[in-house]
Amino acid sequence: KIEAVFCDTGWEHPETYQHISDVCKQLDVKLVVLRSKKYTDFVDMSIKRSRFPSSQRRFCTSELKIKPMIDYILSLTEPCVIIQGIRAKESEERAKLPYECNYFGEYYERIKKNRKGKIVEVWKQDYRRKDVLKWCEHYDASVSRPIFQWSAQEVINHILSAGQKPNPLYSRGFSRVGCYPCIMCRKQEVKLISQEEFGRNRLIDAEQRMKEETPKGSSFFSPGYIPNRFCKNRTYPTVQEVFEY
């Protein structure tokens, strides 16, 4: 019994949604789409938190992907194996991940945090902790990362050899095809987005909504993304200023 599980942030490119649907149909695999129960999408989440996520505060991943996935697993009444297409070379943090693990392993780990100047020990993960521990008494959620040591080219080669096609955004120069755009996107990708009406308008509209619907507003891009001299306020850039840069 195989299911493809997609955590929809509501911030993907239309071609990504189509690609996911096409692949599942071609492989005759059931597609399960998960969404946050708390937020409508990425922009709604950002507005309700009065800021966009950043490299230092990536709450988008936990709120729009991790929590919906946890909710889904807890709805299952049988053990499962979660296959993740994560590669070690994608980032330093991902390189630290094991090849295989227990999906809920972090619920049994303690970490130290600084809270108001005091170091305290807390559980590494505590979302629905009681529900998770109860579920784990009866079932198991194992994680396997079969392409963990592969190169990007090996992944593409494998997709092509299976008669499939990669996400079309890769052929257009994008290195990230999750959120469109990701808060971690490179300047070259921003340049590509600025040349496409859909992407350009989406970013401008999101930032405008943030300005209109929150007390202080917030820029999509963090301070320092471009040199301060190109920012009207000399601190952080607007989307339009980044496009012009």
Predicted regions span which residues?
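Nucleotide-activated chemistry modules centered on ATP-dependent adenylation/adenylyltransferase
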Residues: 1-245
